[in-house]
Protein backbone atom coordinates (compact mmCIF):
# COMPACT_ATOMS: atom_id res chain seq x y z
CA UNK A 1 0.00 0.00 0.00
CA UNK A 2 1.35 3.42 -0.95
CA UNK A 3 2.33 5.68 1.94
CA UNK A 4 -0.25 8.37 2.67
CA UNK A 5 0.96 11.94 2.29
CA UNK A 6 -0.93 13.46 5.20
CA UNK A 7 0.42 16.97 4.70
CA UNK A 8 -0.92 16.94 1.16
CA UNK A 9 -4.35 15.87 2.45
CA UNK A 10 -4.26 18.63 5.07
CA UNK A 11 -3.39 21.23 2.45
CA UNK A 12 -6.18 19.97 0.18
CA UNK A 13 -8.70 20.09 3.02
CA UNK A 14 -7.81 23.66 3.93
CA UNK A 15 -7.85 24.76 0.29
CA UNK A 16 -11.26 23.17 -0.26
CA UNK A 17 -12.62 24.97 2.79
CA UNK A 18 -11.31 28.38 1.75
CA UNK A 19 -12.58 27.94 -1.83
CA UNK A 20 -16.13 27.76 -0.47
CA UNK A 21 -16.01 31.39 0.64
CA UNK A 22 -17.45 33.64 -2.12
CA UNK A 23 -14.80 35.89 -3.63
CA UNK A 24 -16.74 39.05 -2.79
CA UNK A 25 -16.62 38.07 0.91
CA UNK A 26 -12.84 37.67 1.04
CA UNK A 27 -10.87 40.08 3.21
CA UNK A 28 -8.00 42.04 1.65
CA UNK A 29 -4.42 41.14 2.48
CA UNK A 30 -4.09 44.39 4.43
CA UNK A 31 -6.47 42.83 6.97
CA UNK A 32 -5.51 39.15 6.86
CA UNK A 33 -1.82 39.98 7.29
CA UNK A 34 -2.70 41.13 10.82
CA UNK A 35 -4.34 37.81 11.72
CA UNK A 36 -1.79 35.73 13.63
CA UNK A 37 -1.83 33.90 16.98
CA UNK A 38 0.73 36.42 18.24
CA UNK A 39 -1.27 39.52 17.30
CA UNK A 40 -2.79 41.75 19.96
CA UNK A 41 -5.29 43.04 17.40
CA UNK A 42 -9.03 42.86 18.02
CA UNK A 43 -11.07 41.01 15.39
CA UNK A 44 -13.91 43.45 16.13
CA UNK A 45 -11.74 46.32 14.95
CA UNK A 46 -10.48 44.39 11.93
CA UNK A 47 -14.03 43.49 10.92
CA UNK A 48 -15.04 47.14 11.11
CA UNK A 49 -11.92 48.23 9.22
CA UNK A 50 -12.69 45.78 6.40
CA UNK A 51 -16.09 47.38 5.80
CA UNK A 52 -17.52 44.39 3.91
CA UNK A 53 -20.82 44.22 5.79
CA UNK A 54 -23.70 46.47 4.81
CA UNK A 55 -25.65 48.38 7.46
CA UNK A 56 -28.54 45.97 7.00
CA UNK A 57 -26.26 42.94 7.44
CA UNK A 58 -24.80 44.47 10.59
CA UNK A 59 -28.32 45.14 11.85
CA UNK A 60 -29.47 41.55 11.21
CA UNK A 61 -26.42 39.93 12.79
CA UNK A 62 -26.00 42.24 15.80
CA UNK A 63 -29.35 43.73 16.76
CA UNK A 64 -31.42 40.64 17.50
CA UNK A 65 -31.51 37.76 19.92
CA UNK A 66 -32.57 34.33 18.67
CA UNK A 67 -35.95 34.92 20.33
CA UNK A 68 -36.53 38.28 18.65
CA UNK A 69 -35.06 37.21 15.29
CA UNK A 70 -37.38 34.20 14.96
CA UNK A 71 -40.29 36.49 15.85
CA UNK A 72 -39.35 38.90 13.04
CA UNK A 73 -39.06 36.04 10.56
CA UNK A 74 -42.40 34.57 11.66
CA UNK A 75 -44.21 37.86 10.98
CA UNK A 76 -42.49 38.31 7.62
CA UNK A 77 -40.63 41.46 8.68
CA UNK A 78 -37.41 39.64 7.83
CA UNK A 79 -37.02 36.83 5.31
CA UNK A 80 -35.19 33.63 6.15
CA UNK A 81 -33.14 34.14 2.99
CA UNK A 82 -31.91 37.62 3.96
CA UNK A 83 -31.10 36.42 7.47
CA UNK A 84 -29.23 33.37 6.18
CA UNK A 85 -27.29 35.49 3.69
CA UNK A 86 -26.25 37.96 6.39
CA UNK A 87 -25.06 35.24 8.76
CA UNK A 88 -23.28 33.25 6.05
CA UNK A 89 -21.40 36.36 4.99
CA UNK A 90 -20.52 37.36 8.53
CA UNK A 91 -19.48 33.81 9.47
CA UNK A 92 -17.14 33.79 6.46
CA UNK A 93 -15.57 37.06 7.59
CA UNK A 94 -15.32 35.94 11.22
CA UNK A 95 -13.64 32.74 10.04
CA UNK A 96 -11.01 34.69 8.13
CA UNK A 97 -10.28 36.62 11.34
CA UNK A 98 -10.34 33.69 13.78
CA UNK A 99 -9.89 30.43 11.80
CA UNK A 100 -13.07 29.03 13.35
CA UNK A 101 -14.80 26.96 10.63
CA UNK A 102 -14.18 23.40 9.49
CA UNK A 103 -17.04 22.79 7.03
CA UNK A 104 -18.80 25.44 4.95
CA UNK A 105 -22.10 24.83 3.16
CA UNK A 106 -23.57 28.25 2.58
CA UNK A 107 -25.27 27.09 -0.63
CA UNK A 108 -27.29 24.50 1.29
CA UNK A 109 -28.24 27.13 3.86
CA UNK A 110 -29.54 29.56 1.25
CA UNK A 111 -31.48 26.81 -0.50
CA UNK A 112 -33.05 25.83 2.82
CA UNK A 113 -33.85 29.45 3.70
CA UNK A 114 -35.56 30.01 0.36
CA UNK A 115 -37.71 26.91 0.97
CA UNK A 116 -38.65 28.17 4.45
CA UNK A 117 -39.77 31.50 3.01
CA UNK A 118 -41.91 29.71 0.43
CA UNK A 119 -43.43 27.49 3.12
CA UNK A 120 -44.32 30.49 5.30
CA UNK A 121 -45.86 32.31 2.35
CA UNK A 122 -47.87 29.31 1.18
CA UNK A 123 -48.96 27.83 4.53
CA UNK A 124 -49.25 31.01 6.55
CA UNK A 125 -47.35 29.47 9.46
CA UNK A 126 -43.83 28.57 10.45
CA UNK A 127 -42.27 25.11 10.33
CA UNK A 128 -41.49 25.34 14.04
CA UNK A 129 -40.18 27.60 16.81
CA UNK A 130 -36.75 27.99 15.17
CA UNK A 131 -38.09 28.80 11.68
CA UNK A 132 -35.29 30.48 9.72
CA UNK A 133 -32.84 30.64 12.61
CA UNK A 134 -29.20 30.13 11.53
CA UNK A 135 -27.44 27.66 13.83
CA UNK A 136 -23.77 26.66 13.86
CA UNK A 137 -22.68 23.16 14.86
CA UNK A 138 -19.54 21.83 16.53
CA UNK A 139 -17.61 19.68 14.08
CA UNK A 140 -18.45 16.37 15.79
CA UNK A 141 -22.18 16.79 15.07
CA UNK A 142 -23.09 14.94 11.89
CA UNK A 143 -24.79 16.76 9.04
CA UNK A 144 -25.67 14.48 6.14
CA UNK A 145 -23.30 15.04 3.23
CA UNK A 146 -20.74 16.94 5.33
CA UNK A 147 -17.49 15.77 6.89
CA UNK A 148 -16.76 15.35 10.61
CA UNK A 149 -12.97 15.18 10.76
CA UNK A 150 -12.81 16.74 14.26
CA UNK A 151 -9.27 17.82 13.46
CA UNK A 152 -7.95 14.25 13.28
CA UNK A 153 -5.49 13.75 10.44
CA UNK A 154 -6.56 10.12 10.05
CA UNK A 155 -10.18 11.21 9.56
CA UNK A 156 -9.30 13.07 6.36
CA UNK A 157 -9.90 9.85 4.45
CA UNK A 158 -13.29 9.24 6.05
CA UNK A 159 -16.38 9.75 3.86
CA UNK A 160 -18.95 12.44 4.63
CA UNK A 161 -21.76 11.59 7.03
CA UNK A 162 -24.51 9.46 5.48
CA UNK A 163 -27.11 10.65 7.99
CA UNK A 164 -27.79 13.47 10.42
CA UNK A 165 -27.18 13.29 14.14
CA UNK A 166 -30.43 13.13 16.11
CA UNK A 167 -29.92 16.71 17.34
CA UNK A 168 -29.45 17.85 13.73
CA UNK A 169 -32.74 16.25 12.66
CA UNK A 170 -34.60 17.74 15.62
CA UNK A 171 -33.26 21.25 15.07
CA UNK A 172 -34.05 21.02 11.37
CA UNK A 173 -37.60 19.88 12.14
CA UNK A 174 -37.94 22.99 14.33
CA UNK A 175 -36.95 25.20 11.38
CA UNK A 176 -33.22 25.74 11.86
CA UNK A 177 -30.86 26.65 9.02
CA UNK A 178 -27.39 25.07 9.16
CA UNK A 179 -24.57 26.82 7.31
CA UNK A 180 -21.23 25.73 8.79
CA UNK A 181 -19.44 23.55 11.33
CA UNK A 182 -16.84 24.79 13.78
CA UNK A 183 -13.32 23.99 14.90
CA UNK A 184 -12.20 21.92 17.90
CA UNK A 185 -8.87 21.02 19.55
CA UNK A 186 -7.18 17.69 19.00
CA UNK A 187 -9.03 14.94 20.99
CA UNK A 188 -11.67 17.49 22.15
CA UNK A 189 -10.37 16.98 25.68
CA UNK A 190 -8.44 20.20 26.28
CA UNK A 191 -9.46 23.78 26.85
CA UNK A 192 -7.60 24.94 23.77
CA UNK A 193 -8.24 25.43 20.09
CA UNK A 194 -5.51 23.72 18.05
CA UNK A 195 -5.43 20.63 15.84
CA UNK A 196 -3.08 19.53 13.08
CA UNK A 197 -5.71 19.67 10.31
CA UNK A 198 -7.27 23.11 10.64
CA UNK A 199 -4.79 24.85 12.92
CA UNK A 200 -5.55 27.23 15.77
CA UNK A 201 -8.75 29.17 16.39
CA UNK A 202 -8.26 32.70 17.75
CA UNK A 203 -10.20 34.78 20.26
CA UNK A 204 -12.03 37.67 18.56
CA UNK A 205 -11.40 40.03 21.50
CA UNK A 206 -7.63 39.70 21.20
CA UNK A 207 -6.13 37.31 18.66
CA UNK A 208 -3.22 36.33 20.91
CA UNK A 209 -5.68 34.88 23.45
CA UNK A 210 -7.36 31.49 23.41
CA UNK A 211 -11.11 31.16 22.77
CA UNK A 212 -11.07 28.12 25.07
CA UNK A 213 -12.16 24.64 24.16
CA UNK A 214 -13.24 22.29 23.09
CA UNK A 215 -16.15 24.26 21.57
CA UNK A 216 -13.56 26.71 20.28
CA UNK A 217 -15.00 27.61 16.89
CA UNK A 218 -18.51 27.99 18.29
CA UNK A 219 -17.24 30.49 20.85
CA UNK A 220 -15.30 32.52 18.29
CA UNK A 221 -18.24 32.71 15.90
CA UNK A 222 -20.73 33.65 18.62
CA UNK A 223 -18.37 36.15 20.18
CA UNK A 224 -18.04 38.09 16.91
CA UNK A 225 -21.67 37.58 15.84
CA UNK A 226 -21.02 35.16 13.01
CA UNK A 227 -23.51 32.96 14.83
CA UNK A 228 -26.56 33.73 16.92
CA UNK A 229 -26.99 30.22 18.33
CA UNK A 230 -24.62 27.27 18.34
CA UNK A 231 -24.39 23.72 19.60
CA UNK A 232 -21.33 22.68 21.57
CA UNK A 233 -20.56 19.74 23.81
CA UNK A 234 -19.22 19.47 27.34
CA UNK A 235 -17.47 16.66 29.23
CA UNK A 236 -15.25 18.77 31.50
CA UNK A 237 -16.08 22.40 30.67
CA UNK A 238 -16.05 22.46 26.87
CA UNK A 239 -19.13 24.69 26.56
CA UNK A 240 -18.63 26.83 29.63
CA UNK A 241 -14.97 27.85 29.41
CA UNK A 242 -15.21 28.94 25.74
CA UNK A 243 -18.35 30.88 26.67
CA UNK A 244 -16.63 32.87 29.40
CA UNK A 245 -13.51 33.40 27.24
CA UNK A 246 -15.54 35.01 24.44
CA UNK A 247 -18.29 36.78 26.38
CA UNK A 248 -21.28 34.61 25.48
CA UNK A 249 -23.77 32.42 27.33
CA UNK A 250 -23.42 28.64 27.53
CA UNK A 251 -25.35 25.83 29.18
CA UNK A 252 -24.29 22.33 30.19
CA UNK A 253 -27.53 20.41 30.85
CA UNK A 254 -27.99 17.26 32.87
CA UNK A 255 -26.68 14.33 30.82
CA UNK A 256 -29.26 12.82 28.44
CA UNK A 257 -31.75 15.67 28.63
CA UNK A 258 -30.56 16.29 25.05
CA UNK A 259 -30.05 13.53 22.44
CA UNK A 260 -26.50 12.36 21.81
CA UNK A 261 -26.92 9.61 19.19
CA UNK A 262 -25.54 9.44 15.65
CA UNK A 263 -22.65 11.83 16.18
CA UNK A 264 -19.04 11.25 15.23
CA UNK A 265 -17.56 8.56 17.44
CA UNK A 266 -15.49 9.85 20.36
CA UNK A 267 -16.03 7.34 23.17
CA UNK A 268 -16.96 3.72 23.64
CA UNK A 269 -20.66 3.03 23.20
CA UNK A 270 -22.45 2.63 26.51
CA UNK A 271 -19.74 4.42 28.50
CA UNK A 272 -21.22 5.14 31.93
CA UNK A 273 -18.47 7.19 33.53
CA UNK A 274 -18.28 10.97 33.36
CA UNK A 275 -20.35 11.48 30.24
CA UNK A 276 -20.46 14.24 27.64
CA UNK A 277 -23.55 16.18 26.78
CA UNK A 278 -24.48 18.61 24.05
CA UNK A 279 -25.17 22.14 25.17
CA UNK A 280 -26.40 25.38 23.59
CA UNK A 281 -24.28 28.51 23.28
CA UNK A 282 -25.93 31.85 22.59
CA UNK A 283 -25.85 35.59 23.20
CA UNK A 284 -28.61 35.74 25.84
CA UNK A 285 -29.92 33.56 28.65
CA UNK A 286 -33.37 33.53 27.05
CA UNK A 287 -31.89 32.00 23.92
CA UNK A 288 -30.45 29.11 25.96
CA UNK A 289 -33.96 28.44 27.25
CA UNK A 290 -35.39 28.64 23.73
CA UNK A 291 -32.99 25.93 22.56
CA UNK A 292 -33.58 23.59 25.49
CA UNK A 293 -37.35 24.02 25.47
CA UNK A 294 -37.59 23.47 21.72
CA UNK A 295 -35.68 20.19 21.81
CA UNK A 296 -37.18 18.72 24.97
CA UNK A 297 -40.75 19.61 24.00
CA UNK A 298 -40.12 17.65 20.78
CA UNK A 299 -39.50 14.54 22.95
CA UNK A 300 -35.97 13.44 22.02
CA UNK A 301 -36.50 10.07 23.72
CA UNK A 302 -38.65 9.10 20.72
CA UNK A 303 -35.56 9.27 18.49
CA UNK A 304 -32.69 8.42 20.85
CA UNK A 305 -32.82 5.56 23.34
CA UNK A 306 -30.31 7.32 25.61
CA UNK A 307 -32.41 10.47 25.97
CA UNK A 308 -34.41 10.66 29.18
CA UNK A 309 -38.20 10.77 28.95
CA UNK A 310 -38.46 13.84 31.17
CA UNK A 311 -40.91 16.35 29.68
CA UNK A 312 -40.16 20.05 29.70
CA UNK A 313 -41.75 22.04 32.51
CA UNK A 314 -41.59 25.82 32.68
CA UNK A 315 -40.02 26.89 35.98
CA UNK A 316 -42.02 29.72 37.60
CA UNK A 317 -39.91 32.87 37.64
CA UNK A 318 -38.55 33.87 41.05
CA UNK A 319 -37.60 37.52 41.04
CA UNK A 320 -35.83 37.13 44.40
CA UNK A 321 -33.45 34.19 44.51
CA UNK A 322 -31.38 32.64 47.26
CA UNK A 323 -27.92 32.45 45.71
CA UNK A 324 -25.02 30.50 47.15
CA UNK A 325 -21.68 32.14 46.41
CA UNK A 326 -18.47 30.12 46.28
CA UNK A 327 -15.74 32.61 45.45
CA UNK A 328 -12.78 30.27 44.96
CA UNK A 329 -10.85 27.18 45.97
CA UNK A 330 -7.81 28.40 47.99
CA UNK A 331 -5.65 25.76 46.29
CA UNK A 332 -6.57 27.25 42.89
CA UNK A 333 -7.28 30.94 43.57
CA UNK A 334 -8.94 32.93 40.82
CA UNK A 335 -7.06 35.72 39.09
CA UNK A 336 -7.86 39.41 39.67
CA UNK A 337 -10.28 39.93 36.72
CA UNK A 338 -12.52 37.08 37.90
CA UNK A 339 -12.29 38.02 41.59
CA UNK A 340 -13.18 41.64 40.85
CA UNK A 341 -16.05 41.08 38.42
CA UNK A 342 -17.57 38.27 40.51
CA UNK A 343 -17.52 40.50 43.59
CA UNK A 344 -19.15 43.27 41.57
CA UNK A 345 -21.86 40.92 40.31
CA UNK A 346 -22.58 39.60 43.81
CA UNK A 347 -22.80 43.15 45.14
CA UNK A 348 -25.32 44.13 42.49
CA UNK A 349 -27.39 41.00 43.07
CA UNK A 350 -27.48 41.68 46.82
CA UNK A 351 -28.45 45.31 46.23
CA UNK A 352 -31.30 44.13 43.98
CA UNK A 353 -32.78 42.13 46.86
CA UNK A 354 -31.47 38.64 46.18
CA UNK A 355 -30.37 36.68 49.25
CA UNK A 356 -26.66 35.84 49.22
CA UNK A 357 -25.27 32.86 51.14
CA UNK A 358 -21.48 32.46 51.30
CA UNK A 359 -20.52 28.83 50.66
CA UNK A 360 -17.48 26.85 51.79
CA UNK A 361 -17.01 24.07 49.24
CA UNK A 362 -15.11 20.77 49.14
CA UNK A 363 -11.71 20.95 47.39
CA UNK A 364 -11.95 20.88 43.61
CA UNK A 365 -8.94 18.56 43.49
CA UNK A 366 -11.11 15.87 45.09
CA UNK A 367 -13.50 16.05 42.12
CA UNK A 368 -10.65 16.17 39.61
CA UNK A 369 -8.99 13.05 41.01
CA UNK A 370 -12.25 11.08 40.99
CA UNK A 371 -13.01 12.18 37.42
CA UNK A 372 -9.52 11.26 36.24
CA UNK A 373 -9.88 7.79 37.74
CA UNK A 374 -13.02 7.41 35.61
CA UNK A 375 -11.23 8.57 32.49
CA UNK A 376 -8.32 6.22 33.22
CA UNK A 377 -10.73 3.27 33.11
CA UNK A 378 -11.14 3.85 29.37
CA UNK A 379 -8.23 1.71 28.24
CA UNK A 380 -9.14 2.15 24.57
CA UNK A 381 -9.06 5.98 24.69
CA UNK A 382 -10.56 6.48 21.23
CA UNK A 383 -9.49 10.12 20.77
CA UNK A 384 -5.84 9.26 21.43
CA UNK A 385 -6.17 6.18 19.22
CA UNK A 386 -7.42 8.44 16.41
CA UNK A 387 -4.29 10.57 16.84
CA UNK A 388 -2.09 7.48 16.60
CA UNK A 389 -4.00 6.14 13.59
CA UNK A 390 -3.15 9.31 11.70
CA UNK A 391 0.52 9.10 12.70
CA UNK A 392 0.25 12.70 13.86
CA UNK A 393 1.99 14.41 16.75
CA UNK A 394 -0.05 14.90 19.94
CA UNK A 395 -0.44 18.60 20.68
CA UNK A 396 1.38 19.99 23.73
CA UNK A 397 -1.88 21.18 25.27
CA UNK A 398 -2.95 17.58 26.01
CA UNK A 399 -0.58 17.55 28.97
CA UNK A 400 -2.85 19.84 31.02
CA UNK A 401 -5.57 17.18 31.22
CA UNK A 402 -3.40 14.04 31.33
CA UNK A 403 -5.07 11.75 33.91
CA UNK A 404 -1.65 10.58 35.08
CA UNK A 405 -0.92 14.04 36.50
CA UNK A 406 -3.75 13.68 39.00
CA UNK A 407 -3.40 10.02 40.00
CA UNK A 408 -1.18 8.47 42.64
CA UNK A 409 2.18 7.07 41.45
CA UNK A 410 1.79 3.48 40.34
CA UNK A 411 -1.99 3.77 40.00
CA UNK A 412 -3.41 0.91 37.94
CA UNK A 413 -6.87 1.30 36.43
CA UNK A 414 -9.01 -1.82 36.33
CA UNK A 415 -12.71 -2.48 36.32
CA UNK A 416 -12.79 -3.27 40.04
CA UNK A 417 -12.20 0.45 40.51
CA UNK A 418 -15.69 1.09 39.16
CA UNK A 419 -17.36 0.37 42.51
CA UNK A 420 -14.85 2.44 44.46
CA UNK A 421 -15.19 5.41 42.12
CA UNK A 422 -18.99 5.24 42.24
CA UNK A 423 -18.85 5.26 46.05
CA UNK A 424 -16.55 8.29 46.01
CA UNK A 425 -18.90 10.15 43.66
CA UNK A 426 -21.80 9.33 46.00
CA UNK A 427 -19.89 10.71 48.99
CA UNK A 428 -18.86 13.84 47.08
CA UNK A 429 -22.47 14.43 46.01
CA UNK A 430 -23.58 14.00 49.64
CA UNK A 431 -21.13 16.73 50.67
CA UNK A 432 -22.78 19.08 48.22
CA UNK A 433 -26.28 17.93 49.19
CA UNK A 434 -25.57 18.93 52.79
CA UNK A 435 -24.34 22.35 51.64
CA UNK A 436 -27.40 22.82 49.42
CA UNK A 437 -29.85 21.82 52.17
CA UNK A 438 -28.30 23.87 54.94
CA UNK A 439 -27.98 27.01 52.81
CA UNK A 440 -31.37 26.56 51.14
CA UNK A 441 -30.11 27.92 47.85
CA UNK A 442 -31.81 28.09 44.46
CA UNK A 443 -28.55 28.19 42.55
CA UNK A 444 -24.80 28.33 43.18
CA UNK A 445 -22.70 31.19 41.77
CA UNK A 446 -19.03 30.31 41.33
CA UNK A 447 -16.11 30.76 38.93
CA UNK A 448 -16.14 29.00 35.57
CA UNK A 449 -12.40 29.49 35.21
CA UNK A 450 -9.52 30.82 37.27
CA UNK A 451 -9.16 33.69 34.85
CA UNK A 452 -10.36 35.33 31.69
CA UNK A 453 -9.02 34.14 28.33
CA UNK A 454 -5.35 33.21 28.50
CA UNK A 455 -2.59 33.32 25.88
CA UNK A 456 -2.62 30.33 23.55
CA UNK A 457 -1.31 27.17 25.17
CA UNK A 458 -1.37 28.48 28.74
CA UNK A 459 -4.66 27.09 30.07
CA UNK A 460 -4.34 24.63 32.93
CA UNK A 461 -6.72 21.96 34.27
CA UNK A 462 -10.46 22.61 34.38
CA UNK A 463 -10.77 22.85 38.15
CA UNK A 464 -13.97 24.91 38.31
CA UNK A 465 -16.03 23.08 35.71
CA UNK A 466 -15.23 19.39 36.08
CA UNK A 467 -16.92 19.02 39.52
CA UNK A 468 -20.30 19.59 37.87
CA UNK A 469 -19.60 17.04 35.12
CA UNK A 470 -18.68 14.54 37.81
CA UNK A 471 -21.89 15.25 39.75
CA UNK A 472 -23.94 15.80 36.57
CA UNK A 473 -25.27 19.16 37.76
CA UNK A 474 -26.67 21.56 35.12
CA UNK A 475 -24.57 24.70 34.86
CA UNK A 476 -24.54 27.88 32.81
CA UNK A 477 -22.12 30.71 32.14
CA UNK A 478 -23.15 34.36 32.40
CA UNK A 479 -20.75 36.89 30.82
CA UNK A 480 -20.20 39.95 33.01
CA UNK A 481 -17.53 42.61 32.71
CA UNK A 482 -14.08 42.65 31.16
CA UNK A 483 -10.52 42.39 32.37
CA UNK A 484 -8.97 45.80 33.03
CA UNK A 485 -5.22 46.33 33.07
CA UNK A 486 -5.53 49.13 35.64
CA UNK A 487 -8.16 47.70 37.99
CA UNK A 488 -6.64 44.21 37.87
CA UNK A 489 -3.01 45.22 38.35
CA UNK A 490 -1.71 43.13 41.25
CA UNK A 491 1.73 42.03 42.35
CA UNK A 492 2.81 39.00 40.33
CA UNK A 493 -0.09 39.23 37.86
CA UNK A 494 0.35 40.61 34.34
CA UNK A 495 -2.94 42.38 33.72
CA UNK A 496 -1.83 43.89 30.41
CA UNK A 497 -1.97 40.75 28.28
CA UNK A 498 -5.64 40.04 29.10
CA UNK A 499 -6.83 43.65 29.11
CA UNK A 500 -10.27 43.82 27.51
CA UNK A 501 -10.94 40.08 27.64
CA UNK A 502 -14.47 39.09 28.73
CA UNK A 503 -15.11 37.84 32.25
CA UNK A 504 -18.10 36.22 33.92
CA UNK A 505 -19.15 33.43 36.24
CA UNK A 506 -20.86 30.07 36.42
CA UNK A 507 -24.30 29.22 37.80
CA UNK A 508 -24.93 25.66 39.01
CA UNK A 509 -28.22 23.94 39.75
CA UNK A 510 -29.15 20.57 41.21
CA UNK A 511 -29.25 17.50 38.99
CA UNK A 512 -32.28 17.40 36.64
CA UNK A 513 -33.30 20.93 37.65
CA UNK A 514 -32.32 22.26 34.24
CA UNK A 515 -35.42 24.42 33.87
CA UNK A 516 -34.90 26.01 37.29
CA UNK A 517 -31.23 26.62 36.51
CA UNK A 518 -32.13 28.33 33.25
CA UNK A 519 -34.79 30.41 35.02
CA UNK A 520 -32.22 31.55 37.59
CA UNK A 521 -29.77 32.31 34.77
CA UNK A 522 -32.34 34.57 33.12
CA UNK A 523 -33.21 36.33 36.39
CA UNK A 524 -29.57 36.94 37.31
CA UNK A 525 -28.63 38.06 33.79
CA UNK A 526 -31.59 40.46 33.71
CA UNK A 527 -30.65 41.86 37.13
CA UNK A 528 -27.08 42.56 36.06
CA UNK A 529 -28.22 44.25 32.84
CA UNK A 530 -30.67 46.54 34.68
From Swiss-Prot:
Classification via Pfam families: Amidase
Signal sequence bounds: none
Domain of life: Eukaryota
Induction: Expression is induced in response to 2-benzoxasolinone (BOA) exposure.
Entry annotation: catalytic residues: 138 (charge relay system), 214 (charge relay system), 238 (acyl-ester intermediate)
Class of this enzyme: hydrolase
Disruption phenotype annotation: Does not affect BOA degradation.
Molecular-function annotations in GO: amidase activity
Keywords: Hydrolase
EC number: 3.5.1.4
Record has Hydrolase as a keyword: yes
Cited InterPro entries: Amidase_CS, Amidase_dom, AS_sf
Pathway: Xenobiotic degradation
Catalytic reaction(s) noted: a monocarboxylic acid amide + H2O = a monocarboxylate + NH4(+)
Residues where substrate binds: 214, 235-238
Note: Fusarium verticillioides possesses 2 unlinked loci, FDB1 and FDB2, necessary for detoxification of antimicrobial compounds produced by maize, including 2-benzoxazolinone (BOA). The FDB2 cluster arose as a duplication of the FDB1 cluster with rearrangement and expansion by incorporating additional genes.
Reported function: Amidase; part of the Fusarium detoxification of benzoxazolinone cluster 1 (FDB1) involved in the degradation of benzoxazolinones produced by the host plant. Maize, wheat, and rye produce the 2 benzoxazinone phytoanticipins 2,4-dihy-droxy-7-methoxy-1,4-benzoxazin-3-one (DIMBOA) and 2,4-dihydroxy-1,4-benzoxazin-3-one (DIBOA) that, due to their inherent instability once released, spontaneously degrade to the more stable corresponding benzoxazolinones, 6-methoxy-2-benzoxazolinone (MBOA) and 2-benzoxazolinone (BOA), respectively.
Record-stated family: Belongs to the amidase family.
Entry protein name: Amidase FVEG_08295
Organism: Gibberella moniliformis (strain M3125 / FGSC 7600) (Maize ear and stalk rot fungus)
